[in-house]
């Protein structure tokens, strides 16, 4: 086992604070409407330009082991805030640095770190309660657009496109962000259920302009196995042909004789039919087939439930108003499923979302809910270069998370004002002793830090602005974008309550851990000198005389 350095007390904390400052100073230049960019080196390709606090934090690894421990702990603040609220990472980092800085002064003065921590917790608890009281529900599309704009660094076009997407697919709908092809941002909305499987043969295309197969008022056959033998399908095809309607077949696979026969019948115009593969894999495929069955009012033909292809009747088939099948996607519009059944299915999936342990599973389940409930909106981000595209896409994703947080817990005045008003509303918070009072006092001072940093990045005098804002009341604050004072909500400078709350709680949590640290253990630096040079020569091999050949 490698040798370790063990450092105690003030020296350990001082080195940790150095690491905190290096990381926080790099992150906080991005805060506010006049915050600057940070350029991140990439091992290959163009560098990444970002104004996203958590992206900057994740890149930082320090050479000094003890400084690095401090930096990594603050990195945890940023990434936790990003995971929980989706935004507010820079605010959280600034708050953590401010609490650590203030707190270290008290620890150095001989105060009890555990009592300081209890004081910090009391102050945070009181401030969070006030933030929740001040929170206002987001009701209008305009407010959602404003939240998105602020989160995307005052880019109104991003806020507007997110608000439009939420209008179209509802607040629960899935909104995905993709690279666009043009210079402008575009919004595509897919109504109904879309899944990423296209036609199995281009001969099914009946609309050459769209390069797609369009079926009006079709039956939908759902089968969870492979179809290779046309004999299995014949009874179903005959019933559908008699009804004079088209047929969409969704199965694990359709190939061989079965696919060839379907193609021939389509070309000859005997039957309008399209075959596609079922979406997903394994258990997820079964679940998605069941979703489609409920949406279209049909059944999944599976041997497990005693149904076989030969015995299928029209009552077992699903129905839809319209189906569009492209090369890569299939969209089912206006399925004939009962609204009550769809609602029950959505409820069931929501319970699974709450129980899901991995982010990937949760995301896939949320997609299924959206496909059943409303639809999917696609925001295509436009930019001139790839570097700009990456930066803009990250901002759109941040703004999307922020608007979701605003819908969830409401909004408060932005620009660091909500924290100052919470401090005023909380009144006098009392600790059990002088050291706890000091912990409370340091939090109440530290929460000025986000506003101070916004003003500093805008080139203003922080103390003057903070005093002016404290002298006001309600939503009165400072708009750093144009150096004016006024009502923050009216000016459209809003923060989601969840983002502000999470930033404060996470910052205080990690800062408290640092203040109560008394010892640090790190791997000792390797002694470079010890490995230098080759060992001395091999000292002559003596005479080898007498060895007559």
UniProtKB/Swiss-Prot annotation:
Transmembrane segments: none annotated. This is Chaperonin GroEL. Together with its co-chaperonin GroES, plays an essential role in assisting protein folding. The GroEL-GroES system forms a nano-cage that allows encapsulation of the non-native substrate proteins and provides a physical environment optimized to promote and accelerate protein folding. One of its GO terms (cellular component) is cytoplasm. It comes from Leptothrix cholodnii (strain ATCC 51168 / LMG 8142 / SP-6) (Leptothrix discophora (strain SP-6)). GO terms for biological process: protein refolding. Pfam families: Cpn60_TCP1. It is found in: Cytoplasm. It catalyses: ATP + H2O + a folded polypeptide = ADP + phosphate + an unfolded polypeptide. NCBIfam families: GroEL, PRK00013.1, PRK12849.1, PRK12850.1, PRK12851.1. Its EC number is 5.6.1.7. GO terms for molecular function: ATP binding; ATP-dependent protein folding chaperone; isomerase activity; unfolded protein binding. ATP binds at residues 30-33, 51, 87-91, 415, 479-481, 495. Forms a cylinder of 14 subunits composed of two heptameric rings stacked back-to-back. Interacts with the co-chaperonin GroES. Belongs to the chaperonin (HSP60) family. CDD domains: GroEL. Keywords: ATP-binding, Chaperone, Cytoplasm, Isomerase, Nucleotide-binding. It comes from the Bacteria. InterPro entries: Chaperonin_Cpn60_CS, Cpn60/GroEL, Cpn60/GroEL/TCP-1, GroEL-like_apical_dom_sf, GROEL-like_equatorial_sf, TCP-1-like_intermed_sf.
């Amino acid at each position: 086992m490698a040798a370790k350095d063990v450092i105690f007390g003030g020296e350990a904390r001082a080195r940790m604070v150095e690491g905190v400052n290096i990381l926080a100073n790099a992150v906080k230049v991005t805060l506010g409407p006049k915050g600057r960019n940070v350029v991140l080196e990439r091992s290959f390709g163009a560098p990444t330009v970002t104004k996203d606090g958590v992206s900057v934090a994740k890149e930082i690894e320090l050479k000094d082991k003890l400084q690095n421990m401090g930096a990594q702990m603050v990195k945890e603040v940023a990434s936790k805030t990003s995971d929980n609220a989706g935004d507010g990472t820079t605010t959280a980092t600034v708050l953590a640095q401010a609490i650590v800085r203030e707190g270290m002064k008290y620890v150095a003065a001989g105060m009890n770190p555990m009592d300081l921590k209890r004081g910090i917790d009391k102050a945070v608890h009181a401030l969070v309660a006030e933030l929740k009281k001040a929170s206002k529900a987001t009701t209008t599309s305009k407010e959602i657009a404003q939240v998105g704009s602020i989160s995307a660094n005052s880019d109104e076009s991003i806020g507007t496109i997110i608000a439009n997407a939420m209008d179209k697919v509802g607040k629960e709908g899935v909104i995905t962000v993709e690279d666009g092809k043009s210079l402008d941002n575009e919004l595509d909305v897919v109504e109904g259920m879309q899944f990423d499987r296209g036609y199995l043969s281009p001969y099914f295309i009946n609309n050459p302009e769209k390069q797609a197969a369009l079926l009006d008022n079709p039956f939908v056959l759902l089968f969870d196995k492979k179809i290779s033998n046309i004999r299995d399908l014949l009874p179903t095809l005959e019933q559908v042909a008699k009804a004079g309607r088209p047929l969409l077949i969704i199965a694990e696979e359709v190939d061989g004789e079965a696919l060839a026969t379907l193609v021939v019948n389509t070309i000859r115009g005997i039957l309008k039919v399209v075959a596609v593969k079922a979406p997903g894999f394994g258990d997820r495929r079964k679940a998605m087939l069941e979703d489609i069955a409920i949406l279209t009012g049909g059944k999944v033909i599976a041997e497990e439930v005693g149904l076989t292809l030969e015995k299928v009747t029209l009552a077992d088939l699903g129905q839809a108003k319209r189906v569009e099948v492209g090369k890569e996607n299939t969209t089912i519009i206006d399925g004939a499923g009962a609204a009550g059944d769809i609602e029950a299915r959505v409820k069931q999936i929501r319970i699974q979302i709450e129980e899901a342990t991995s982010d990937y599973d949760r995301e896939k389940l949320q997609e299924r809910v959206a496909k059943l409930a409303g639809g999917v909106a696609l925001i295509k981000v436009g930019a001139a270069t790839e570097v700009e595209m990456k930066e803009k896409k990250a901002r759109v994703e941040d703004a999307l998370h922020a608007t979701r947080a605003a819908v969830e817990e409401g909004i408060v005045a932005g620009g660091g004002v909500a924290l100052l008003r919470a401090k005023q509303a909380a009144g006098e918070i009392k600790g059990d002793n002088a050291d706890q009072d000091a912990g409370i006092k340091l939090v109440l001072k530290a929460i000025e830090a986000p506003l101070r940093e916004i003003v500093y990045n805008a080139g203003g005098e922080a103390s003057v602005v903070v005093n002016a804002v404290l002298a006001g009341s309600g939503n009165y604050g400072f708009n750093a974008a144009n150096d004016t004072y006024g009502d923050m909500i009216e000016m459209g400078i809003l923060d989601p309550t969840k983002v502000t709350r999470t930033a404060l709680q996470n910052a205080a949590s990690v800062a408290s851990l640092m203040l109560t640290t008394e010892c640090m253990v790190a791997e000792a630096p390797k002694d470079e000198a010890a490995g230098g040079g080759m060992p001395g020569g091999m000292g002559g091999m003596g005479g080898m005389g007498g060895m007559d050949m």
